[in-house]
Amino acid sequence: MRKKILFYLLALFIFSCNRNEFSPNQKFDATTPEDVNAREISELSKKTAGAHIRIAVSGDTHTDYTDSKGFVDYVNSQDDIDFVVLNGDITNFGLLTEFQGIYDIYNKLKVPFITVLGNHDENAEGNFVYQRMYGSPNFTFDYGGIKFVCHDANSREHSFDHTTPNLDWLRMNLSKDEGTQYIMAFSHVPPIDADFDQTLRSGYENLFNSTPGMLASVHSHRHSADSIYRANGTGIPFIITNTILNKTFTIIDITNGQLTTHPVTF
Amino acid sequence: MANLLRTLLLFNILPLLLCSVQTARAQSKLINTLIPDQLIMQYAGSIGYISGGIGYNLWKEKSTLSFHFGYVPKNKGGELDIAAIKLDYKPFTIHIGDQLIFHPINPVAFLSYTFGQEFGFEFDSQVYDKGYYFWSPALREHLGLTSELKILGDGSSKIKSISLYVETNTNDLYAINWYHDKKGIPFTDIFRLGFGLKMNF
């Protein structure tokens, strides 16, 4: 009888775990997808944008798979969302298995999803994992006459060496592409946060405010109810959205360059 | 691992050096203590694509303490260098015929340390306030189970027996993620497999 139980336990633990692993820190394995952002942007470009654009902005999933699935199910039940943004902090520890866990869930979205790099995602080999899996942390894409500028604003992960956010790269890319009238930015850490390089803050805010056609800069990171601020009380809105951990995301509607937002709890 | 080995050696060698009178017997005893009881090769198991190690039997072969060094090549998700120390315990022994000994379920605990720039023992205190990130990027604590089949030799070779084992393990960070979302992350999903071979002397 004892032997039977032992054999049963043995079979259970061998067959229940199905994965070899070389290290929790390995940068990829045989099944890891590559260049997901490029693929999703290509999918998005096949869509025809209407007069109203609706974006579902989610952030800070960390490894809350349950609520991430809840979010994906909610978005899939809607038919008016153009695309989804996952605005950083996909992981807790920057580990491959965490990136893959969230990818597997977001990949079930019926609409394209664009993934931005968060501060937690830069831990250990996370930066490399992200770049192989999703692509460059600084990238742009166009949809519905709007140029979206996504970038790494996780200054603390770069030891506040004044390279992040990369203002030179932003200056070059904050110009309208052919066929776009407006520009919108996505990055994880908001300028008002202590994790943002405060020596770059005013330069960053001024750059956005002096960019013609700039609509808004959208951030997450703070795990709190949606808030909007304007630098010195004027200029474009800096929008800080909630976290999937709170079962909440933010809808951004854009019509003729007019932008409105509202949180949705699912 | 280098440090640990050094400590181990120092603790064994220092007393001998301090003694002015050494007997040949003591020397041979020391050498016998230091010669490992096992050479170990392992595939995967979270300490390298391939890893090699030496093991020492404890408590009448009920337990093994082993030291490993693992490597993940660039084309397998590296490059990573990893050192590990393992301690296992074999509570059950099942004899199958004359030549096979089966240890079906053996708890194992190990520490792994990943070398390299991205892996500080802790986060840089110049950049992060204490507790900003609570974990060590380099040091992982693992718990797992192994199952081992020992094939006995006929006594004619220096290698007394060969053991084949399969090991499943999880680590502190995977366990934390599971703890925070038990519904979304099945318990078995946090375990990873490795396979190994031991030559027992």
Language-model features and meaning:
Chain B
Residues 36, 47-49, 80-82, 140, ...:
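Membrane-spanning beta-strands of outer-membrane beta-barrel proteins
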Residues 75-110:
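Mid-chain, structured segments of secreted extracytoplasmic proteins
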Residues 57, 63, 69-71, 75-77, ...:
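Outer-membrane beta-barrel domain signature
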Residues 33-46, 52, 62-73:
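Transmembrane beta-strand segments that form the barrel wall of outer-membrane beta-barrel proteins
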Residues 1-30:
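Bacterial Sec-dependent N-terminal signal peptides
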Residues 37, 50, 70-76, 92-94, ...:
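Sequence/structural signature of outer-membrane beta-barrel proteins
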Residues 29-32, 50-64, 81-92, 193-199:
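Feature captures outer-membrane beta-barrel proteins of Gram-negative bacteria and organelles
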Residues 96-201:
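Outer-membrane beta-barrel transmembrane domain signature
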